[in-house]
């Protein structure tokens, strides 16, 4: 069961110790431990079936039907962004952003969040009128309007075209720098992980196989020598061997 951290200023926003999650006889997470600090951006890589989404669902309190054990502490204020923006098609954009937000200034907060993601003026649009990238901007606004201490993102840009993904990377980096939530991004994209994260984890057979700090200033240049070194190291942990590029 997850417990919730209450106001310990120096405590990590997320603390996981010896976490086990199983589906029937199959163990998905096997004694996993992890801390995430306030304002820290952590990316999680792993092959299909390694337990990435299971960990995210555990942190989001969405796995109550899964058997398991271990210590799991998360903040009360958390938001989740999925690959599918999950907007309600019968509600307009602003209504989607403030859905469930029971505050007297909810509409004002929602408009401010939409302005942050570059969608001011689209408050009354229907979701079907938006592009895929715009729908994900709405999903980000919906998450950030709640001022979360923890932002969980499960392949949020996986369905977007390459150019839109790059724009969303810049937007997410700026928003996280401004709001300072702890972030866990689940992704299959090694370059995306190295571009955005302060730290990249590789999950293998339900345990953390690698924990690599990204010691490159932001915004990051993919042509930076260190970027290539970290990419190669992560790919090796994922079972992909790379060869150095030979000079022409």
UniProtKB/Swiss-Prot annotation:
- What's the encoding gene here? ssuB2
Location relative to the cell: Cell inner membrane
Per UniProt, subunit arrangement is: The complex is composed of two ATP-binding proteins (SsuB), two transmembrane proteins (SsuC) and a solute-binding protein (SsuA).
* Membrane topology listed for this record: Peripheral membrane protein
Entries under SMART domains matching the protein: AAA (SM00382)
Q: What is its EC number?
A: 7.6.2.14
Tell me, in a sentence or two, what this protein's role is: Part of the ABC transporter complex SsuABC involved in aliphatic sulfonates import. Responsible for energy coupling to the transport system.
The protein's name: Aliphatic sulfonates import ATP-binding protein SsuB 2
- Give one Pfam family, short name only: ABC_tran
Q: What does the record list as coiled-coil region(s)? A: none
What is the similarity comment for this entry? Belongs to the ABC transporter superfamily. Aliphatic sulfonates importer (TC 3.A.1.17.2) family.
Q: Identify a single GO molecular function assigned to this protein.
A: ATP binding
Per UniProt, which keywords does this protein have?
A: ATP-binding, Cell inner membrane, Cell membrane, Membrane, Nucleotide-binding, Plasmid, Translocase, Transport
InterPro entries associated with the record: AAA+_ATPase, ABC_transporter-like_ATP-bd, ABC_transporter-like_CS, ABC_transporter_ATP-bind, P-loop_NTPase
């Amino acid at each position: 069961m997850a417990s919730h951290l209450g106001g310990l200023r120096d405590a990590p926003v997320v603390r996981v110790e010896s976490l086990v999650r199983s589906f029937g006889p199959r163990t998905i997470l096997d004694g996993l431990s992890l801390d995430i600090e306030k304002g820290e951006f952590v990316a999680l890589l792993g092959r299909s079936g390694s337990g990435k989404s299971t960990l995210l669902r555990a942190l989001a309190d969405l796995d109550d039907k899964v058997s398991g054990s271990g210590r799991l502490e998360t903040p009360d204020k958390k938001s989740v962004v999925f690959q599918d923006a999950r907007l309600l098609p019968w509600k307009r954009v602003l209504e989607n952003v403030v859905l469930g937000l029971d505050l007297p200034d909810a509409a004002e907060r929602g408009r401010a969040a939409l302005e942050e993601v570059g969608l001011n003026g689209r408050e009354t649009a229907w979701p079907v009128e938006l592009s895929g990238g715009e729908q994900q901007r709405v999903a980000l606004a919906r998450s950030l309007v709640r001022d979360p201490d923890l932002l969980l993102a499960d392949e949020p840009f996986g369905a977007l075209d390459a150019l839109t993904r790059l724009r969303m990377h810049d937007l997410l980096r700026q928003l996280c720098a401004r709001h300072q939530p702890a972030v866990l991004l689940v992704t299959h994209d090694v370059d995306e992980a190295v571009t955005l994260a302060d730290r990249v984890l590789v999950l293998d057979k339900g345990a953390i196989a690698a924990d690599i700090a990204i010691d490159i200033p932001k915004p990051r240049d993919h042509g930076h020598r260190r970027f290539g070194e970290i990419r190669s190291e992560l790919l090796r942990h994922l079972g992909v061997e790379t060869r150095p590029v030979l000079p022409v």
